[in-house]
Amino acid sequence: MDLTERHKRILKALVDEFIQENRPVGSKTLFDKHDIGLSPASIRTVLKDLEDYGYLASKHTSGGRIPTERGYRFYVDSLVILYELTLKEKQRIQQEYLKMQFKLDQILKATASVLSSLSNAAGIVIGPAKNLDTLKHLELIHVRGDEILMILVMRSGTVLHRNIFVDRNYSQEALYQVSKYLNDNLKGYDIYEIQNVVVPNLMVRRDGPEDFTRIAELLSSAMNPDNSEVTLYIDGFKNLYANFRDEEQQLSQVLSLLDDQGFLKEFFSEYIDQDGVYTIIGKDGNRSMSGVSIITSNYKMGEKKIGALGIIGPQRMDYNRALPLVDFTSKLVSEMVTRISK
């Protein structure tokens, strides 16, 4: 059933009140504190409708009502009025980054802290997947006999080392020529593009050094990144203890969620390719997250989407501030990551 404007007005007022006070909300509270323009009796009728439709649930001990996951979902999608961060708040966020050297790991660690402190939830950042990072420089070094060391310097500042065993002994001069050819042709591409597009095309062209085609496939396969190397940055456990202090089961659940790094990496990675800010509420997620909401957005290096960040907290989080916070932070991180990659 479509909600009327009266239903929407009262649902918004109730969710706003519950987020602010964290206790069930009754018709008297809505009448006294919100300019709804209805009598308490009319408000009670609308509240009963909203409960029947699945947007609210009763707390019989108090007589008040609380939002359900469906209620929160409608509130976030249709009712929330986004707060605009003030210049002072934006400058506070920017100041946190000016305290550090511009290195990727420091930026991402600081981002988790910023998100946590300004949202009163847990801040989380997923570092770039190695196969999405773009190549800045490659070097091949003869180690001994049939062993070559390949050094990959990525735009993010990550340095990867790979030992390759070949079918013959190559001189350092030959490896220098291959390295130069690869740098001229591979720079700026990510590992997926290098393996699946660029190197195959170079092998067809056959305009490289004499030794290139003999070792190209070995070099390409050796570039495979270990995606377990993806780093996870989390801050704000104290906020979660405070938010869920009266809800032991939900606290245990959210701590278990944060302890499952494999799940978190997989979960947030699903949003790297998605533009915009996403809100996942409770069972919207692909595992039990009752009472928990996640707000996430990606960040970019230039035009390339390389990672994700966000906040995890109670469903009663202040969405009108949390959503613009995540949005602004993702854009700021994208600017800084792009700057250090040049």
Swiss-Prot record:
Stated name of the protein: Heat-inducible transcription repressor HrcA
Keywords carried by this UniProt record: Repressor, Stress response, Transcription, Transcription regulation
Protein's gene: hrcA
Record InterPro entries: GAF-like_dom_sf, HrcA, HrcA_C, WH-like_DNA-bd_sf, WH_DNA-bd_sf, WHTH_transcript_rep_HrcA_IDD
Task of the protein: Negative regulator of class I heat shock genes (grpE-dnaK-dnaJ and groELS operons). Prevents heat-shock induction of these operons.
One Pfam family per UniProt: HrcA
Annotated Gene3D superfamilies: 3.30.450.40, Heat-inducible transcription repressor hrca homolog, domain 3, Winged helix-like DNA-binding domain superfamily/Winged helix DNA-binding domain
GO biological process annotation, one example: negative regulation of DNA-templated transcription
NCBIfam families tied to this protein: hrcA (TIGR00331)
Entry's Gene Ontology molecular function annotations: DNA binding
Protein origin, superkingdom: Bacteria
Family membership: Belongs to the HrcA family.
UniProt feature coiled coil, ranges: none
